[in-house]
Amino acid sequence: MMYASLVHWLALAVALAVPFVTALGSVPYPQDDPFYYPSENGWQNEAPGTILRQRKIQAASLGIFEWKLDAWQVLYRTAGARPDKPSYTVTTFLVPSHAHRDRVVTISSPENSNFIQCAPSYAFRKTGVLEIANFEPRWEQMLYTLFLAEGWIVNAPDHEGPESAFSAGRFGGHMVLDSMRAANNFKPLQLSSNPMHIGHGYSGGSTPNGWAASLHESYANELNVVGWSLGGSMTDPLYTLNSLDGKPTSSLVVAGAIGLMDAYRDEVGNLLDDEVWTEEGKIAEKVMRNSCVYESVIRYFGTTFQSERYIKGGRNLSSWPQMRKISNMNTMGHNPRFTPRKPIFMFHALYDEEINWHQANKTAVEWCNNGANVRFLTYSSTSLVHVTTYLLNLPYIVQYMRDRFNGKDWYGGGCQFDVESQNPALDVNVLGERFRGILEAALDMLGKEIGPNDSILKNRLKAGQNPNTHHKTKLHVLKKGDISPGEGGDHTKESKKAAAKFKAEKKHGKHH
């Protein structure tokens, strides 16, 4: 989910760039590109992960800066909100030079929109003009070099599918898992007979990624998944949407409601139009269906949507039973049956201003209660927020993936909840190493060959950047029947009280 701190400086740029880009872009938008749709009838009868179309592309950053690697896109058969509901979507494969053919990292980029034009796959294309309107997936794509430099093949699915079903986790989970199947089936990748997969997603990408972890055992257990990484996790849809209302990125309240309803339209029909929205609400929905996240955020910056102006009677979205039912179905940890069975690294800022810490922590605890293997790292500094927490954790994410690909537990296994109380940004050495690496990696992809033989990440992950040794205070190790995860959250009255309680307990030695 993205991100109030970037909206201000993007507002003018987007306003000026959108007409220019729309007029001059040389690559058709997804809604106008036949590649995004099956060419023949009968695709519904194909197995999930079957390749329906394929093409080689020139990958680029911001539409013009070419990436020096091999890139393909495939349209593949997948499933929608339920395993028996056939669907299709596109994924993008990035292959670095000297790639390890047995290691694939699947990245769920945040899209946070109800418009197929905002799909990550389109953001990878070289269009010939500077593209910044759909900045949500583009900024994260600039960080992919961190994984490509390791020699790992990157798989980046359009996890919202043709419906652009933002916040519908199960829907996206199927599409993530089937993108892994598609990778295994795609011969040009030349993968080994049983390649290892790791899934990663932050913020809006954590939802499909977390659900892929949850559905792996029941839906695609033949996949050799060795781990999952997720942070800033939106694990409870309605909880998150309610907490965002009236905040800078409040347009996501409408976008999230639309996404949930679109994923289950055969069950709920036109609930939003028939029962929920006022005329102003319908206008807002139309805006969401025709814009990417920054455009909608700028237009509705700080709007309170759960009010009489947008919702009939000024009701809360949770007051509709259908909405509660679907949200519960898409809440991670709600159903013990869908518990991840592969190691998970989760991280979250205690004072995350976008996605409340409580819901992610609750999900981790519930997963642990049901036998999952979770390492949950909390950042308790008030100065660490949504975006900076992600950037500062990139070395940790890479280290976790390295260890998992090499068969290591990374931290000893089981469930473990830790807190890092010192802001890493206050440590000049860590700040310099982390951000220099990120910046160098981003710049490196502009004109150089990308792969493990370049100079970017060599010796990047030193002991000072490993969460097992750096500024880590062990909060508690979870044991069977002994779950006590502490308190924290955003700056609401309830969360401030909880955070104060946590600090008091820590001071008196209850957390050590």
UniProtKB/Swiss-Prot annotation:
The active site is at 203 (nucleophile), 352, 386. It is an enzyme of class 3 (hydrolase). Optimum pH is 7.0-8.0. Disulfide bonds join 118-292. GO terms for cellular component: extracellular region. Keywords: Disulfide bond, Glycoprotein, Hydrolase, Lipid degradation, Lipid metabolism, Secreted, Signal, Virulence. InterPro entries: AB_hydrolase_fold, Lipase_secreted. The keyword Hydrolase applies. Coiled coil: none annotated. It comes from the Eukaryota. Residues 480-512 are annotated as: Disordered. Pfam families: LIP (PF03583). Residues 488-497 have a biased composition (Basic and acidic residues). Its EC number is 3.1.1.-, 3.1.1.3. It is found in: Secreted. Belongs to the AB hydrolase superfamily. Lipase family. Class Lip subfamily. This is Secreted triacylglycerol lipase LIP5. It comes from Malassezia restricta (strain ATCC 96810 / NBRC 103918 / CBS 7877) (Seborrheic dermatitis infection agent). The gene is LIP5.
